[in-house]
Regions:
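Intrinsically disordered, low-complexity regions enriched in serine/threonine
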Residues: 1-42, 122-351
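Compositionally biased, flexible interaction segments
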Residues: 59-176
Length: 351
């Protein structure tokens, strides 16, 4: 009998949101060393989020946008202050970072008091004010690239902030932020977010609070970053047929129509993917240039399934993007475990 100890590896348990060990994951000895590829051209690669967002530089965000206040005129933490505090933490843990990519939405325009009685056409640039209600940003750890199922991926950090989640009409109070760290597929800029790389919503009153929370997240993730990647890569070892894919899509549509009580009775996991994302994943199954089903095969891998859904949720509003991205990862892991027979909660999507 073979008594050789099997290599262990962390495994994401989507229903619990915890990390465990698994003997089936890819051994750590198989991890390739970091390689340096050409720098990513920010003007010639897919955006990490689409929806109704637009690009802006950190300089424009800092110099051309006002900072909203609370009702008592106390300043909120600026978007620029948020980004810079997380970057400081990122450099402390990971070293050199690439320039930040920023996407914003929901522009709020105004004017200075001296121009209150002017027509819009008469306003000068100096009399106009603006800020963006929602912000998402990302930057990469410089020179750190790995390969997952033949695709180069970059370790990245970033965050999301939405003023609409703060109580600006009251007195100064804690503000909400989200920070993440994870692997981003280079060819499509899809983020593969797992529960151990995402803070969720947290409250902060100062940039020091933000930096402290970022340091906690990054310091906890850094020692296991390659294990995290190999857990994702293991999705490429499991395939689903076209019939199974269609069954999953049908179940996802049915899931949205089920009453909450029925979902609870069936023991179903929490799925927050909307019909628009499901439809986009179906189109991607046929059309996506990187992850569609190949003509000579009758199946796709669960890594392809994950990327189809990750691509789909890039059309989500900024303030919901990270939660839905992580939900995609949980769903792919759940289907993998259902096929293995280790997670009955997701078996419903395969029946």
């Amino acid at each position: 009998m073979n008594t050789e100890q099997q290599p262990t590896m962390m495994e994401i348990i989507p229903t619990d949101g915890i990390i465990a060990t698994s003997p089936n994951a890819i051994p750590m000895d198989d991890i390739e060393d970091a390689v340096v590829l050409d720098d990513i051209d920010p003007d010639n690669h897919p955006n990490f989020i689409e929806s109704n967002t637009s690009a802006i530089t950190l300089e424009e965000l800092t110099e051309k946008c006002i900072v909203p206040t609370f009702a008592d005129n106390a300043l909120t933490i600026s978007h620029g202050g948020f980004i810079k505090s997380v970057i400081e933490a990122g450099r402390t843990v990971f070293g050199e970072l690439t320039p930040v990519e920023i996407r914003v939405s929901h522009q709020i325009n105004g004017r200075v008091p001296s121009a209150l009685h002017k027509k819009q056409s008469e306003l000068s640039d100096a009399e106009k004010t603006t800020y963006f209600q929602r912000l998402a940003w990302v930057c990469h750890v410089a020179g750190l690239t790995r390969y997952i199922n033949g695709q180069p991926v970059n370790l990245c950090i970033g965050g999301v902030r939405a003023y609409n989640e703060d109580k600006l009409f009251g007195r100064e109070s804690p503000m909400k932020f989200k920070i993440f760290v994870g692997w981003q597929v280079r060819v499509c800029s899809n983020l593969c977010l797992t529960c151990d790389g995402f803070t969720g919503n947290f409250d902060a009153l100062t940039v020091s609070d933000i930096k402290e929370r970022a340091l906690q997240l990054f310091s906890g993730f850094d020692p296991h970053k390659d294990e995290n990647l190999r857990t994702l890569e293991a999705l490429g070892n499991t395939r689903i047929t076209e019939e199974q894919f269609c069954g999953i899509i049908g179940r996802l549509r049915l899931y949205k129509a089920l009453p909450t009580a029925t979902r609870n009775e069936l023991g179903l996991p929490n799925i927050i993917l909307g019909d628009q994302a499901v439809n986009a994943a179906v189109r991607g199954y046929v059309e996506n240039p990187n992850f569609k089903k190949e003509d000579n095969l009758d199946s796709i891998t669960l890594f392809q399934l994950l990327q189809l859904f990750n691509e789909a949720v890039k059309q989500t509003y900024i303030d919901k993007w990270l939660e839905r991205n992580q939900n995609c990862t949980d769903f792919a892991f759940g289907i993998q475990q259902a096929i293995d027979g280790s997670n009955p909660a997701y078996s419903w999507f395969l029946t």
